[in-house]
Regions:
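Short acidic-glycine-tyrosine-enriched beta hairpin
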Residues: 36, 77-95
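Glycine- and acidic-residue-biased ligand/ion/polar-headgroup-sensing regions
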Residues: 58-77
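Sec/Tat signal peptide C-region and signal peptidase I cleavage site
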Residues: 16-20
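Ligand-binding loop in jelly-roll beta-barrel domains
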Residues: 68, 95-116
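Bacterial N-terminal signal peptides
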Residues: 6-15
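A short glycine-rich, His/Asp/Glu-containing loop-to-beta-strand
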Residues: 27-52, 63, 113
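Positively charged n-region of N-terminal signal peptides that target proteins for export
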Residues: 1-4
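Histidine-centered metal-chelating micro-motifs
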Residues: 50-53, 89-101
């Protein structure tokens, strides 16, 4: 019985994390789908200073910064990167599961273009 409880607990956690990956579903306050077709999905992303997202996943994506800002990203393996962007800056992100946090002093507003193919 002692072995069953941890296995059940881990199984439940895995199911929660697996379902909690789509940013538009787990964090609609920060992610809004503004376009979706079989090739791409475009997310409107907004984070005020100090705001943090829950754990979520993206496929490969292009990020277009509408405003500048400083964002910290912590991946599922615990790696942390901090990036400062300028308005109009474009960047590539490999598919990943992560948490994002606005560690700057201004609201971050960006478009995330997720590639489906």
């Amino acid at each position: 019985m002692k072995k069953v409880i941890p296995i059940v607990g881990i199984s439940i956690l895995v199911m929660i994390v697996a379902k909690a990956q789509d940013p538009a579903k787990v964090d609609p306050a920060h992610y809004k789908v503004i376009f979706n077709n079989p090739q791409v999905r475009v997310l409107d992303v907004r984070l005020k200073p100090g705001e943090k997202t829950p754990v979520h996943s993206h496929p490969n994506l292009v990020v277009y910064s509408l405003t500048g800002g400083t964002i910290k990203s912590t991946t599922a393996d615990g790696k942390t990167t901090t990036v400062t962007t300028k308005p109009g800056q474009v960047g590539w992100r490999n598919a990943q599961t992560h948490i994002s946090e606005n560690v700057g002093k201004t609201e971050i507003h960006a478009l995330g273009i997720e590639l489906k193919r």
